[in-house]
Amino acid sequence: MSKPLQVKQIDTDVLIIGGGTAGCYAALTISRNSDVSVLVAEKANIKRSGCLAAGVNAINAYIVKGRRPQDYVDYATKDAAGIVRNDLLLTAAEEFNEVTADMEKLGLVILKDENGDYVARGNRNIKINGENFKPLLADAVYKSKNVDVLNYVNITDLLTENGSVYGAVGFSIMEETAYVIHAKAVLIATGGAAGIYKPNNPGFSRHKMWYPPFNTGAGYAMGLLSGAEMTTFEMRFIALRCKDTIAPTGTI
């Protein structure tokens, strides 16, 4: 006989759906700049979840010496054939280096040359030892004031009324528990949508894609179903690869 479904009610000021790199850093930022309560809901565990769950060997968006944020905007605009929001790109590019320096303070190992400068890899990248990127970020989140984490809870729908969002509902993937979360503000940080197309690699390698297969597009669906305004859906990035190459990123 199965146990009856338990329903838990939670109230918070800010609900962050998704505990990947973006969700965790958002929680850190809010905690540092306010006294509001924050709840991070993650369907896996924030220590190893999201695009950087397994780590990364470079910061692939950085303004190296001699370059400006606008240079990155120009590069990304050309790469996407002009189908971009330049304002969003510039806002992000202006924060690249500050966030990178912050991650170094949290313990991220960034390779440096004999002069103590970051080792650049091209015009927009620097080399790192980033296998522990996510654990470092998770540790910082757990130490932050007024931040709670719900691991292994999958959020499925937003709660809306009169065109406004006031929370979300979801369920535990480990226990027979449903969650009703009320929040004054909701931030969706669930990543993109992987697996839309047939995998490039066969068998056990089919998960070697640009984004983790667990990025299901759930955040997009929640927004669309709730009437949220969506943007930049006109452009779909596809990483180009050389024939017979098995790699998670592009090779061209």
For each feature predicted by the language model, list its residue ranges:
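Generic start-of-chain signal for non-secretory N-termini
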Residues: 1-13, 21
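Conserved N-terminal/central alpha/beta ligand/cofactor-binding core
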Residues: 3-6, 36-37, 43-166, 170-172, ...
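Core beta-strand elements of the Rossmann-like FAD/NAD(P) dinucleotide-binding domain
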Residues: 9-12, 175-185
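N-terminal Rossmann-like FAD-binding beta1-loop-alpha1 element of flavoenzymes
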Residues: 14-40
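Short, well-ordered coil/turn residues at beta-beta hairpins
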Residues: 18, 183-185, 189-190
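Extended, hydrophobic alpha-helical segments in both membrane/secreted and soluble proteins
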Residues: 186, 215-219
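A short acidic, glycine-rich active-site loop
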Residues: 206-215
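Acidic, metal-coordinating catalytic segment for phosphate/diphosphate chemistry
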Residues: 223
